[in-house]
């Protein structure tokens, strides 16, 4: 069992009273809720997580609204100051989400996890009256989303809106060309357009009024994506064959210059609907060949075709890639791969492809091996190349995992041999790899109970046996946020590389580098968009709806100011965009 995913779920009613978790008394209030406890330390049983016994854990409480929805989520004591981070939800009579309040840190008096009225607290914390995302729906049984109003006083009255319609030949913006795929796989533009109403249309408009249409066919496949810039349309068409496979993508450039070679994405399939041909705009096509088990065994791009080369992939009986490389097989020979199952069998002795021990069941002409993989065991240690480095035997079962590999270094005849070792939770705890010029690199990793790395010890040994070590140490807070990274070289004093501090919403607030000599502060707006970076040598402010530029409410940066040093003259830039969001 993966201990990182063990979660305790408890359905609690009003009679359940108080529970203890994460050294806090959790009051489930007078409502029905679900208590979720994720352990951060080793524990003796599920019941121990609900007691104050020193076992650290992450505790969440979800309160239901009585109709299957969640009315409030509380992350107990998760903020840097140990406050509850609380967010609330409201639904309409049909069960659709109608309002979502921004998460707000709330200091609990005596107990944590109790249901709270947080609207006023959120308004005070953010300094905005508009702290709820609101959703408006179509008044029908379909309950289609019509408008989404975001948070922030600057966005009051502004929404991301949707309109639902269909294709209409009489209205230019809702007119769609009809492309077909011929029996021979060629693109054909039909003389007869789509019948009115045969395509489902959705018009989206962001907070700045930029409009985007999408049209879908009866199979719910996207047929046309249309972006508007005034009266100019930027159309991307998607063309499917009779089996529903995407065959052509025709971007806006193709509409002005209908050249498939320069502007189109082209895909072709075999009789089993496997992709066998792929061509990107302006590029030579790539070919893909599969074996009888539907696994990719050969591929070729334009550059390889000029040199009569194919990439090949050999698999074991479990479908895992064991050998990768290039070969000089003829096109006719490659095509016959689909008639068989290409397998790599591990043989005894230093035989097979690149002396790896793997023998392909399909003949390869002049194979050049780039990657060899071994799985499940460490029997490869005695094979050619590995035996020179004395790789240790694994002490924990690695069944199902990659245990060793050989990597060919381009431009030389050298190989890099490596092995990975796991703990009982299938995490890599030691990784060893040889070096082309001799010697070894070893990485040993220690993990927390939850699976976060606590330390990584790197040992570099040269060909003469001389070793150097460096250790990275990672520290986390009570909510598993990374707070410190330290580095130690050999036996020298440890150096604090970086120290992170976070605000009450979990956003990175300050970075301190090199034992705190250099510090950088970060600022955000109510939508969590980065608005400022402040350091001793450099500062920068990003403006969206304020500043000197034209206000942008959709997330584009309208202007930027910066300066280097405390007394430097501020400088800045203003940005403008077209309706496609492109910088102009």
Task: Report the location of each language-model feature.
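Bacterial Sec-dependent N-terminal signal peptides
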Residues: 1-26
């Amino acid at each position: 069992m993966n201990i990182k995913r063990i979660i305790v779920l408890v359905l609690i009613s009003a009679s359940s009273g108080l529970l203890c978790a994460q050294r806090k008394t959790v009051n489930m209030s007078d409502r029905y809720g679900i208590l979720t406890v994720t352990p951060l330390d080793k524990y003796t049983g599920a019941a121990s997580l609900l007691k104050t016994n020193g076992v650290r854990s992450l505790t969440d409480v979800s309160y239901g609204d009585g109709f299957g929805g969640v009315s409030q989520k509380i992350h107990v004591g998760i903020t840097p100051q140990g406050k509850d981070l609380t967010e609330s939800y409201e639904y309409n009579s049909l069960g659709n989400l109608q309002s979502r309040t921004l998460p707000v840190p709330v200091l609990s008096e005596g107990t944590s996890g109790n249901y709270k009225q947080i609207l006023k607290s959120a308004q005070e914390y953010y300094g905005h009256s508009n702290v709820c995302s609101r959703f408006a729906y179509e008044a029908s049984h379909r309950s289609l989303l019509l408008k989404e109003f975001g948070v922030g006083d600057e966005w009051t009255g502004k929404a991301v809106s949707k309109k639902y319609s269909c294709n209409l030949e009489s209205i230019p913006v809702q007119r769609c060309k009809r492309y077909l795929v011929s029996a021979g796989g060629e693109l054909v533009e039909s003389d007869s357009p789509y019948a009115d109403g045969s395509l489902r249309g959705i018009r989206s408009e962001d907070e700045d009024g930029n409009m985007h249409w999408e049209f879908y066919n009866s199979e719910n496949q996207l047929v046309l994506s249309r972006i508007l810039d005034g009266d100019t349309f930027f159309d991307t068409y998607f063309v499917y064959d009779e089996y529903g496979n995407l065959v052509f993508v025709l971007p806006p450039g193709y509409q002005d210059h209908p050249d498939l070679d320069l502007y189109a994405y082209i895909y072709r399939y075999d009789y089993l609907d496997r992709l066998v041909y792929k061509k990107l705009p302006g590029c030579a096509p790539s070919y893909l060949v599969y074996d009888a088990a539907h696994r990719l065994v050969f591929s070729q791009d334009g550059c390889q075709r000029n040199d009569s080369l194919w990439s090949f992939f050999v698999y074991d009986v479990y479908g895992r890639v064991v050998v990768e490389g290039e070969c000089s097989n003829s096109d006719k020979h490659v095509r016959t791969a689909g008639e068989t199952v290409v397998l790599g069998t591990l043989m005894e002795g230093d035989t097979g492809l690149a002396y790896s021990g793997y023998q392909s069941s399909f003949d390869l002409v002049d194979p050049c091996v780039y990657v060899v993989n071994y799985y499940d065991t460490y029997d490869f240690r005695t094979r050619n190349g590995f035996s020179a480095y004395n790789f240790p035997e694994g002490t924990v079962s690695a069944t199902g995992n990659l245990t060793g590999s050989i990597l060919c270094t381009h431009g030389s005849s050298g190989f890099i041999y490596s092995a990975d070792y796991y703990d009982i939770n299938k995490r890599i705890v030691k990784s060893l790899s040889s070096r082309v010029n001799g010697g070894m690199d070893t990485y040993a990793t220690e993990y927390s109970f939850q699976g976060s790395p606590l330390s990584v010890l790197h040992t570099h040994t040269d060909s003469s046996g001389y070793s150097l070590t460096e250790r990275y140490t990672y520290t986390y807070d009570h909510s598993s946020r990374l707070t410190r990274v330290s580095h130690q070289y050999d036996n020298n004093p440890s150096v604090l590389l970086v120290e992170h501090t976070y605000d009450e919403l979990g956003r990175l607030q300050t970075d301190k580098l090199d034992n705190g000599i250099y510090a950088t502060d970060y600022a955000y707006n109510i939508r969590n968009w980065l608005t400022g970076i402040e350091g001793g040598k450099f500062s920068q402010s990003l403006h969206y709806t304020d500043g000197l530029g034209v206000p942008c409410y959709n997330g584009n940066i309208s202007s930027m100011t910066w300066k280097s040093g405390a007394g430097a003259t501020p400088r800045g830039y203003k940005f403008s965009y077209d309706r496609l969001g492109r910088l102009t």
